[in-house]
Structures are given as C-alpha cells and as structure tokens.
Design a protein with these regions (language model features):
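Bacterial Sec-exported substrate-binding components of ABC uptake systems
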Residues: 2-3, 15-53, 156-184, 244, ...
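Short helix-initiation/N-cap motifs at beta->coil->alpha
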Residues: 33-35, 89-97, 219-228
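A local structural motif
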Residues: 39-44, 81-88, 210-220
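A short, structured surface patch at a secondary-structure boundary
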Residues: 51-99
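Alpha-helical, coiled-coil/dimerization segments enriched in small aliphatic residues
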Residues: 73-78, 195-224
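Proline-aspartate-enriched helix->loop->beta-strand connector
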Residues: 104-109, 127, 231, 235-239
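Extracytoplasmic substrate-binding proteins
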Residues: 117-189, 276-300
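Structured C-terminal subdomain patch of bacterial secreted/periplasmic proteins
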Residues: 238-300
Length: 300
C-alpha cells in the first residue's frame, strides 16, 4: 500500500468520523405525534410536507418546504396566494418516496389518514411526524399546527398567529345574528354521491365556533357519504355546495325530493370553492371561510 493510498484512506476515515460526530452532536427535540415519538433536529432546514394544511402551517411560521405533495400544478400557489420554489414529491395520495429521499430532508410531515401506512418507510428516509389533517376536526388541525411549530422551533410565532386567529374569529362571531336559527350543510357533490361535512368536520366545527349551526349531527365520522333521502331528513336551511358534479346534481334536481329541502325552497344553495372550504384546512383558509359564510348568510 503506497503512502498516497494511506493518506487518502485516512482522510476518508477522518471525514466519516467527523460527519458522525457532527450528527451525534446535533441537538434534537422529541416530538409526540399520532404514530409515536420522533427525535427531530432542533432547527430543521429541509422539510417535506405531504398535506396542504402542513404547507400552510410552515408558511405561517416563515418556513418554505423543500418538497411538497400536490395533485395539480396550481394547488400550492392557490393555497398560499403566491408562488414558492419547491420540488413536487408526488401526490398527497401517493407520495414518491424516491424523490423525497433525493431531497435529503431532515423532517417529513405526513397525514394520519393518508400516510400512517408508510410511516416506517418515511422514517427510514428522515425523522417523520404523523399528524391529523384530512377528515379531522378544526381543533385537531389546530393541534397539528401547534405540533409543527414545536417541531421546527417556532412556538413564539405560533402563539402570535393563534392569538391573531382567535381575534379574527371573535370579530366574525360578533357579525353572526344570535337569533338566526338557520342550520347549514357543507356538501361535496361527487360523480355518484354527496359527502356531507358534519358538525365535527373542519369547516363544520369552525362554523359552529362562530355560532353557525350544522344540520348534520351525531355522525360517526366528521364527513359522511349520504343519499338524497338522508339529505331530506337532515333538511338543511342553507347548503354550501363545495363542488357540484353536474351529473349527480342534475339527477337530484330532477327528483321531487330535492325540492322538499328547505334550502332549495328558499333559494339558499350557494356554490363555494372546494379547495378553500374542504382541502386547505389552514388558519388563513379558516378565516376566509367564516368571512364568506357570514357574507352569504347575510344576503337573506
């Protein structure tokens, strides 16, 4: 073995040892989440977010993720109201683990509903926390925001933003007539069914918080698939229609039962943006939802 070879090998060993020492000495914090406990870097620099509300939370805290899962090219810009630089890492339904790994993240944030099944695979790539967003309540989404802030070391920014959020919701609540007893339903008309967002859904619980009651109560899940007959039974006074599949809507409108619904009889069926009302689930989205709901309700 030549002196040059020995020198090269020694250099590589020193570099490896140095890297391991640096990794070992890096400060971490333990985060409790839906899939257990994870040690994350004290100041994560390369975060991958696999759900829109997590992207929103990071943006509120002044952090731009290096990788984001999205279905459409305009989803993130629509969510944030601005363009940011990031790498697409597949869709929320099917994240691309290879792309995520190539980014060498130091924190991955996944959704309990969508990603608990691949938690171990994500954890092999980088420290991963699993939080509630999809099919979760408003308060559960707030808790997820708090956990993200803790994970990235931005609790002061979190406290300030939540205080502003509460202030805005309290201001909105004052605009709601306490004598208005109309009950609302948020519904997504798909090709073959309607998904109703009940009182424990993100938007349902949010609206209840400012004094707008939900017609869909005592459901097993925050969102439920219902028939026209069930809709007649719940009989909402107001329907916020977050996306209307033309085929199903036409079919229902041709059914005499449709005209028995109070909201239909009174002309209180309003089309609202599905992304805003049912997909984003962030603080800014929540504030926009309550403002729009109040505006629509005050038209009558």
């Amino acid at each position: 073995m030549t002196a040059l070879t020995l020198l090269v090998l020694s250099s590589l060993m020193l570099a490896a040892c140095s890297g391991q020492a640096e990794q070992t000495n890096e400060k971490t914090r333990t985060i409790t989440h839906e899939a257990g406990k994870t040690k994350v870097p004290e100041h994560p620099k390369k975060v991958v977010a696999l759900e829109y509300s997590f992207v929103d939370a990071l943006d509120e805290l002044g952090i731009t993720p290096v990788g984001i899962a999205q279905e459409n090219k305009t989803d993130v810009s629509g969510l944030l109201g601005k363009d940011i630089a990031f790498t697409e890492v597949g869709t929320r339904q099917q994240p691309n683990l290879e792309v995520i790994s190539s980014l060498q993240p130091d924190l991955i944030i996944g959704d309990f509903n969508r990603h608990k099944g691949i938690y171990k695979q994500l954890q092999e790539i980088a420290p991963t926390i699993i939080l509630k967003s999809r099919n979760a309540t408003y308060e559960e989404n707030i808790d997820s925001f708090k956990t993200i802030a803790e994970a990235v070391g931005k609790t002061k920014q979190m406290d300030d933003r939540l205080a502003l959020h509460e202030e805005r919701l309290n201001a909105a609540k004052k605009k709601v007539d306490p004598n208005d007893d109309r009950k609302v339903m948020v519904g997504v008309f798909r090709a073959d069914s309607l998904t109703a967002h009940g009182e424990t859904s993100f938007d349902g619980e949010l609206l209840e918080k400012i004094g707008i009651e939900n017609a869909v109560t005592k459901t097993a899940e925050p969102t439920v698939t219902i028939t026209l007959e069930q809709m007649v039974k719940w009989d909402p006074d107001v329907i916020f229609m977050a996306e209307a599949d033309p085929k199903l809507l036409k079919e229902w409108k041709n059914n005499p039962l449709w005209n028995q619904i109070t909201a239909v009889k009174n002309g209180e069926v309003y089309e609202v943006n599905r992304d805003l009302w049912t997909r984003y689930r962030g603080l800014d989205a929540a504030e926009q939802i309550v403002d729009e709901a109040i505006q629509l309700l005050q038209q009558k």
